[in-house]
Amino acid sequence: MTVRDLGIPDILRHRGTLEVLDRDMVEGEAVKDIYLRAFTADVYLTSANAISEDGIIVNIDGNGNRVAAITWGPKKVIFIIGLNKVAQTVEAALSRARGTASPINAQRFDIKTPCQTDGICHNCNSPESICSYVHFLRNSRNKGRHVVVLVGENLGY
């Protein structure tokens, strides 16, 4: 939501010189096509659920498309991260991802999980769990592929 809240997809779309792959602009099977096409993108814009003070980026994903693209595929991955997502340790970053971002995402996507109901992570293993994939990015073997833009304000959740 950070990238969308900043209006970046609309800005890029209005330039008219780029193809913007945006799952929120399509429905049904076309969403899956966007997920697959993201692997061959020149640039993948995303945020993170959390980042530790020593730079470990933590993301939790329901389908795995985002963490897969972060790991492999697009030529460059740019993270735009607000200060509210910075945690002191990787353990605190994981706790933030599970306890803050996941319940909000479950509500956003209307996923029927315990956290969607009460906003508290129950570490559930429900078939609809939005926490199927937990991803830690601690370095990048491809120099320059991962770029972090840390914005000095609260962005996203």
Report residues per predicted region:
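N-terminal active-site beta-alpha-beta segment that forms phosphate/nucleotide-binding
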Residues: 1-46
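Conserved phosphate- and dinucleotide-binding cores of soluble alpha/beta proteins
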Residues: 37-157
